[in-house]
């Protein structure tokens, strides 16, 4: 997967297959390893949480064709950390050069940084090997009180997640007749599902550009959730962006791309997950994806317009999934990213199919 300017161009991968949900229903009926609860506000919203699935996951970054005349090369890579979706049991970094780890000041993402000086290698390969327990997501797993920084960033627009008169008008239409915060959030969620199509045939998808989403009504998961977040923030509902991968149900393989989702903040409950693009693909699961996540998400970073550490010379990073690289202060896109996984409770090998 190539990633110019820190933006992954690979397709976002399908989090789950329909067959999984058939198994899920059986598990709900017959296994004590699953728990389900419902909240009735306008409609029942099921939350399903799996007992932890343990996986090995390797994030491989390959930087190619570095110019030997460069004076300095900076490489920043997102690092997974323990959170709502996962518990990181081990995190082993394999790098041929020294590195440092810091947290970005706005979202607290863990960031690996490498600085190269002459002689500059032509190629650089860094691998991060994780062992993680995947938890699924429900609001109770998150601290219900956002920090002042979270409050600030969860309300303001970004370069691509804008709030303009068009977004405000759409939001007003979406929340009409809804009085509670969760009902207004559900109205926005339903609006996005009904006015967007999962369609990557028109160039420009994947940047999370709210204006493009409004004009075309098409895109991938990034575009769906950028529109949701812009509309939520237009209504003064705290909302944030998350990106990582969805680990398939196979025993092992290569994950073909990223997946992203959104969360909004419900006072007294916490951050509530939503996945509008998966709900569009599976309308029968729209209630499920408003308030729950598949227990196969592996999170890499939170937020948009990320300021790296040390700070990059270019613009804030729009989406931080692939490595971001600067050569003598200029963005450099000759990088390949691969994510491999293995279910530690199963054997075998399988390369997952591309996004659909």
Regions of interest found by a model, annotated:
Residues 68, 119-124, 179, 233-235, ...:
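A short, structured loop/turn motif at beta-sheet edges
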């Amino acid at each position: 997967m190539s990633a110019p300017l820190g933006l992954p161009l690979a397709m976002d991968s399908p989090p789950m297959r329909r067959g999984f949900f058939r198994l899920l229903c059986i598990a709900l009926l017959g296994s004590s390893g699953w728990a389900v609860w419902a909240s009735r506000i306008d409609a029942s919203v099921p939350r399903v949480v799996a007992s932890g699935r343990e996986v090995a996951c390797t994030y491989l970054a390959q930087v190619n064709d570095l110019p030997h005349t460069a004076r300095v090369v900076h490489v920043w890579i997102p690092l997974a950390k323990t959170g709502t979706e996962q518990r990181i049991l081990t995190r082993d970094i394999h790098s041929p050069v020294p590195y440092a780890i810091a947290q970005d000041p706005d979202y607290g993402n863990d960031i690996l940084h490498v600085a190269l000086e002459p002689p500059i290698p032509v190629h650089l390969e860094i691998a991060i090997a994780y062992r993680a327990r995947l938890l699924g997501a429900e609001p109770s797993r998150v601290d219900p009180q956002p920090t002042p920084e979270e409050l600030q960033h969860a309300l303001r627009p970004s370069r691509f997640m804008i709030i303009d008169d068009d977004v405000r008008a759409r939001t007003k239409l979406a929340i009409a007749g809804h009085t509670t915060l969760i009902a207004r959030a559900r109205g926005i969620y339903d609006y996005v599902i009904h006015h967007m199509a999962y369609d990557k045939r028109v160039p420009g998808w994947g940047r999370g550009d709210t204006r493009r989403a409004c004009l075309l009504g098409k895109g991938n998961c990034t575009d769906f959730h950028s529109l949701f977040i812009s509309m939520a923030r237009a209504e003064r509902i705290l909302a944030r962006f998350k990106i990582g991968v969805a680990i398939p149900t196979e025993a092992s393989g290569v994950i073909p791309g990223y997946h992203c989702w959104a969360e909004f903040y419900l006072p007294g409950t916490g951050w509530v997950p939503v996945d509008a693009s998966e709900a569009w693909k599976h309308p029968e699961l729209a209630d499920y994806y408003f308030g729950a996540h598949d227990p196969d998400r592996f999170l890499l970073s939170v937020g948009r317009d990320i300021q790296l550490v040390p700070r990059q010379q270019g613009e804030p990073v729009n989406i931080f999934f692939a490595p971001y690289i600067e050569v003598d202060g200029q963005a450099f896109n000759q990088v390949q990213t691969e994510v491999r996984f293995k279910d530690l409770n199963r054997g075998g090998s399988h390369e997952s199919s591309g996004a659909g």
